[in-house]
C-alpha cells in the first residue's frame, strides 16, 4: 500500500513538473509573439535565448488565447462533479476562542465536519483523511487565543495553501447578526486577476458543493484587496422595496503566504509560490 502511494506520488509530481515546464515555455513564446506584434524589444533573458527564438519559427502551437496553466490538474477529475468532504481541526490544546472559531468555520462550509485534534500526529491525521475519502483538510492555528493562520490541504496529492489570518471577528461579536444558514451558498470572488489568484479561487471554490443554488439566500464573498482576502458571509431577504442583507459572520481577512504542491504532512513537497518579505517590492506588488 505504501509503495503504491509512493509510486503514484512520484508519477504525479513528474507529470506536474512536465506541465509546469511546458507552461513556462508557452509563456515565453507568448511574450515573443506579443513583442513581435507590437514592435517592442524582447526582455534580456529571452533575447539571449537563441534556441527559444530558433524553435519559435517552427512552433505551431501558438494560439490567440493562452492555454490554461495546467496547474489545477488536482481538481480536474472532481471539480463540479464530486461534493467536497471537508474536515476542520485545530492545533493541539486549542483555546476556547480557537475552538469557537473552528465551529464557525465548520458552519461556513457545507458538508464540513469538525474534528477535535486530541493527540493526533499530522501524518496519522492525513492518512485517516485519505482513507475516509476526505477531499480537504482545514487546520487552524492561534497565538495567545487569537487565530493566526488557516491551512487548506487537498487530497490525495495536494496542493496545500497556507494563509495568515487578520482582524478575526467571531459571530457573537457582530451586532445585529443574522441567523446562521446551512444551505449551499452563492459564492462571489472579486478582483482575482493573476494566474496565482485564479489558483487560489480554484482551491477555495472546491471547498463548497457544486451545482446551482437558485433558492439559496446565503452569500459568501471572497474579495481581494491588496492581496488580503476579505471573507464575509451574508443572508438576504427579498422585500417589496428590494433586498435586505444581514451579516452572519465570522468576519476575517486572510493572506496567502505559501503554496505547496504536496499534502500537509509532506515537508519535502515542492514550493509552488512563497511570499518573500525580504524582496524590496514585496509590500508594493500585488500577487493575486
Swiss-Prot record:
Region forming the signal peptide: none
Cellular localisation: Nucleus, Nucleolus
A Gene Ontology molecular function term of the record: snoRNA binding
Domain of life: Eukaryota
GO cellular component: Mpp10 complex; small-subunit processome
GO biological process: ribosomal small subunit biogenesis; rRNA processing
Keyword field: Nucleus, Ribonucleoprotein, Ribosome biogenesis, rRNA processing
PROSITE patterns referenced in this protein's UniProt entry, alphabetically: BRIX (PS50833)
InterPro entries recorded: Brix (IPR007109), IMP4/RPF1 (IPR044281)
All residue ranges annotated as the Brix domain in the record: 84-265
Subcellular location, principal: nucleus
Gene3D superfamilies in the record: Probable brix-domain ribosomal biogenesis protein
PANTHER family reported in the protein's UniProt record: U3 SMALL NUCLEOLAR RIBONUCLEOPROTEIN PROTEIN IMP4 (PTHR22734:SF2)
Record function comment: Component of the U3 small nucleolar ribonucleoprotein. Required for the early cleavages at sites A0, A1 and A2 during 18S ribosomal pre-RNA processing.
Assembly description: Component of a heterotrimeric complex containing IMP3, IMP4 and MPP10.
The protein, known as: U3 small nucleolar ribonucleoprotein protein IMP4
Gene coding for it: IMP4
Amino acid at each position: 500500500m505504501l509503495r503504491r502511494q509512493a509510486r503514484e506520488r512520484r508519477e504525479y509530481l513528474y507529470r506536474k513538473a512536465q506541465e509546469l515546464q511546458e507552461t513556462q515555455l508557452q509563456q515565453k513564446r507568448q511574450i515573443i509573439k506579443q513583442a513581435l506584434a507590437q514592435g517592442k524589444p524582447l526582455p534580456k533573458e529571452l533575447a539571449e535565448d537563441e534556441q527559444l527564438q530558433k524553435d519559435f519559427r517552427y512552433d505551431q502551437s501558438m494560439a490567440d488565447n493562452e492555454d490554461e496553466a495546467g496547474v489545477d490538474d488536482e481538481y480536474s477529475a472532481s471539480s463540479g462533479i464530486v461534493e467536497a468532504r471537508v474536515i476542520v481541526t485545530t492545533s493541539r490544546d486549542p483555546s476556547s476562542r480557537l475552538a469557537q472559531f473552528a465551529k464557525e468555520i465548520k458552519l461556513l462550509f457545507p458538508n464540513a465536519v469538525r474534528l477535535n485534534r486530541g493527540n493526533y500526529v499530522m501524518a496519522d491525521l492525513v492518512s485517516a483523511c485519505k482513507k475516509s475519502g476526505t477531499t480537504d483538510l482545514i487546520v487552524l492555528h492561534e497565538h495567545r487565543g487569537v487565530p493566526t493562520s488557516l491551512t487548506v490541504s487537498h487530497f490525495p496529492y495536494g496542493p496545500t495553501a497556507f494563509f495568515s489570518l487578520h482582524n478575526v471577528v467571531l459571530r457573537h461579536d457582530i451586532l445585529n447578526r443574522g441567523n446562521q444558514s446551512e444551505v449551499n451558498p452563492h459564492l462571489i470572488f472579486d478582483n482575482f486577476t493573476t494566474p496565482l489568484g485564479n489558483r487560489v479561487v480554484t482551491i477555495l471554490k472546491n471547498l463548497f458543493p457544486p451545482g446551482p443554488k437558485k433558492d439559496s439566500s446565503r452569500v459568501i464573498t471572497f474579495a481581494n484587496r491588496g492581496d488580503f482576502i476579505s471573507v464575509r458571509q451574508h443572508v438576504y431577504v427579498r422585500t417589496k422595496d428590494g433586498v435586505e442583507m444581514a451579516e452572519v459572520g465570522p468576519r476575517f481577512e486572510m493572506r496567502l503566504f505559501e503554496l505547496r504542491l504536496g499534502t500537509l504532512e509532506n515537508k519535502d513537497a515542492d514550493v509552488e509560490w512563497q511570499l518573500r518579505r525580504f524582496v524590496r517590492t514585496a509590500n508594493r506588488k500585488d500577487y493575486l
